[in-house]
């Protein structure tokens, strides 16, 4: 995983302490669009925690509504597509990429994924709902086989999006 912000990398490292040490290659600070070029097709799992508008976290950070404006969305979506494409390139055949945002905005979630997939024949969607169910403490009420969109009023979380993609070749 690559991150430009060292403080976010530290948060990810803390979260990964719950995972067996031999299951994690590491957290790298850098630009995910280019840093992964050195490892093309080498990772089993990659998580893209994409920079986004943060609209899904408004309940916890109401002041963030003043940090973004609608004109920011196209540039963020372009960056998200670049990061997702680079992550897929860095993943070996059979490996998984998790694309995650804390935004429910379609331009930052499904449309980004759909756009990237339209240009690739080596990737398929995986069942994100089953993956979430396998680690959930209680039944989250998700539709099987789909991307996952969590909502504050339904799931008691931020509005987060997850798509799982499998590299087929």
What does each of the following model-derived ranges do?
Residues 1-169:
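S-adenosylmethionine
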């Amino acid at each position: 995983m690559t991150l430009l912000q060292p403080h976010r990398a530290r948060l990810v490292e803390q979260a990964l302490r719950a995972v067996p040490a031999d299951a994690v290659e590491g957290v790298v600070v850098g630009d995910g669009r280019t840093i992964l070029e050195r490892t093309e097709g080498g990772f089993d799992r990659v998580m893209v925690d994409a920079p986004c508008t943060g609209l899904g976290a408004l309940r916890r950070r109401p002041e963030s509504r003043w940090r973004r404006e609608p004109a920011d969305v196209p540039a963020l979506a372009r960056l998200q597509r670049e990061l997702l494409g680079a992550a897929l390139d860095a993943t070996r055949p059979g490996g998984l990429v998790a694309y995650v945002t804390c935004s429910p905005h379609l331009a930052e979630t499904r449309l980004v994924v759909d756009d990237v997939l339209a240009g690739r024949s080596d990737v398929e969607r995986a069942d994100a709902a089953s993956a979430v169910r396998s680690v959930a403490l209680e039944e989250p009420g998700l539709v099987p086989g789909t991307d996952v969109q969590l909502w504050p009023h339904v799931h008691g979380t931020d509005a987060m999006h997850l798509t799982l993609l499998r590299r087929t070749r």
